[in-house]
Amino acid sequence: DKHWIYYPEKEFIFHRNFIQSNISPYLAPLGTSSITCEISYSPYKKIDKEKIVERVVNDLILANYIDRNDEILAEDIVDLKYAYIIPDIDYKSKIKKVFDFLESNHIYSAGRFAEWEYYDTDDAILSGKRTAEKMGSG
């Protein structure tokens, strides 16, 4: 029934899992689940990309999300090098200059990365809606 599960424990490689099939049964084939495991890394916190799937599966078993005998039907790795915003002390004034320039050229920003905000899914949808309204009125 949960769709976002956080794992602060250091024993798990992932820190957040998104279970799409708990949002809608249409997001996975009948009788199966769909899960995204979010893993952060940096030059200071390295991961072994060759063994990442094996580690994730083992950690999902450890977290009692899957059973050792469960069949994994598909796997995919998406590496987002710049997935998290890391602001500096003056980032708001810098971003305002960029946004002002873009909007003066009728370029509109929408979403988590474009707006430099930490958005959940509902916030991202509302951001897109606001941007669409802005574009429609311009």
Where is each model-derived feature located?
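C-terminal segments that line or cap access tunnels to active or ligand-binding sites in enzymes
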Residues: D1-Y108
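A conserved FAD-binding loop/helix module that cradles the flavin
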Residues: L102, I107-G136
